[in-house]
A protein has these predicted regions:
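N-terminal Rossmann-like dinucleotide-binding module
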Residues: 1-28
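Hydrophobic residues in well-ordered beta-strands that form the structural core
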Residues: 34, 74, 99-101, 230
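Rossmann-fold dehydrogenase core element
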Residues: 86-104, 125-128
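Contiguous beta-strand/loop segments that form the cofactor/metal-binding neighborhood of enzyme cores
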Residues: 164-236, 264
Length: 264
C-alpha cells in the first residue's frame, strides 16, 4: 500500500492476538492497532476495512463494517453462499457504501489487454475455455483448507481464481453449472472438483481445482479464428496469441510490485 500513489494511508491494523498485532504494526510503521472488531469499526477515523479473516467469518465481519458506515474490501471467497452475498450487496447499496470481493487477478494489466483482444474479435467467437489450478495443501485435516466449518475445500480456496478468470473472459454468468467429477474428503470438503459451465452463446468452459495435486495454473481460450494460452493465469504476466494463418505472438505485461497494487 505504501508504494502505491494517490491512496489513503494504512494507519490501523486489527489482529485478534495483541502481541502479533503490535509486532505487525511496528514492523510496518502503523501507528494504531486494535484487538477487537468492535473497536475498529467504532473508530471515526477509519474509512474502509480490508477483511481477510477465515472464510466463514467474512459475512459477519463485512456486515459489522457496513453497519458502522465503513467501505469494505473482502478477501475471496466473498461469502460461502449466494444468500449472504446478496444481503451484503443490498446493505452496501442502501447505505451508499462500497463493497467488493478482493479477487486481485481481475485488475492485472495483462487482463486489460486480453479483454481488448476478445472484444475486437481477434480469435473470433469463443467456443471453449479451460483452466486448472492445483497444489498439495499441507497441515492437519482440521486446518482451514480442509475444514468445512471454516469454508475450506478446493472450490472455495482456489477454484475462485478459476471462476474469476472465466468471468474475465466471458463477461457474464453461465447458464448452467455441472459438477462432472468431485472427491469429498472425510471432513466433508472437496479435495478435487471439475466443473462444466455452459453459456447462452454456446460456449463451454471447464474448471479443474484441487488441493491434493500439483497442477500448472494454465488456461486456454479457443475461438473460431484462433486461440489464446496463458501459462499462469493467476499471476498473468504472459499470454500466447495464435491466430489462424499467422505466427504465434507472445504478449507480456510484467507487474510493478507484486500484482496486488492494481486492485488497490
Amino acid at each position: 500500500v505504501k508504494k502505491v500513489e494517490d491512496v489513503a494511508d494504512n494507519d490501523m491494523i486489527l489482529d485478534v492476538g495483541p502481541e502479533s498485532a503490535k509486532a505487525f504494526a511496528m514492523e510496518h510503521d502503523i501507528p494504531r492497532y486494535y484487538e477487537s472488531y468492535e473497536a475498529l469499526v467504532k473508530d471515526q477515523d477509519v474509512d474502509a476495512v480490508y477483511v481477510a479473516t477465515p472464510n466463514t467469518l467474512h459475512y459477519e465481519n463485512c456486515r459489522l463494517c457496513l453497519e458502522h458506515g465503513k467501505h469494505v474490501l473482502c478477501e475471496k471467497p466473498f461469502t460461502i453462499n449466494e444468500k449472504q452475498a446478496q444481503e451484503l450487496y443490498s446493505m452496501a447499496r442502501d447505505r451508499h457504501l462500497f463493497i467488493m470481493e478482493g479477487l486481485w487477478i481481475w485488475f492485472l494489466p495483462l487482463y486489460d489487454r486480453l479483454r481488448s483482444i476478445l472484444q475486437q474479435g481477434v480469435i473470433g467467437e469463443i467456443k471453449h475455455i479451460s483452466c486448472q489450478y492445483g497444489f498439495v495443501a499441507t497441515g492437519a485435516r482440521k486446518d482451514r483448507k480442509f475444514n468445512s466449518g471454516l469454508g475450506g475445500g478446493a472450490l472455495l480456496d482456489i477454484g475462485i481464481y478459476n471462476l474469476g478468470f472465466l468471468r474475465i473472459v466471458t463477461g457474464c454468468d453461465p447458464q448452467n453449472v455441472e459438477t462432472t467429477k468431485v472427491h469429498i474428503n472425510e471432513n466433508g470438503t472437496d479435495d478435487y472438483s471439475c466443473l462444466k459451465l455452459t453459456y447462452n452463446d454456446g460456449c463451454i468452459a471447464e474448471s479443474v481445482q484441487t488441493i491434493g495435486e500439483e497442477l500448472k495454473r494454465n488456461a486456454r481460450i479457443e475461438g473460431t479464428k484462433g486461440s489464446i494460452f496463458l501459462p499462469d493465469f493467476q499471476h498473468a504476466k504472459t499470454l500466447i496469441l495464435e491466430v489462424d494463418g499467422k505466427e504465434p505472438e507472445t504478449i507480456e505485461y510484467p507487474v510493478d510490485i507484486n500484482g496486488f497494487e492494481y486492485e488497490i
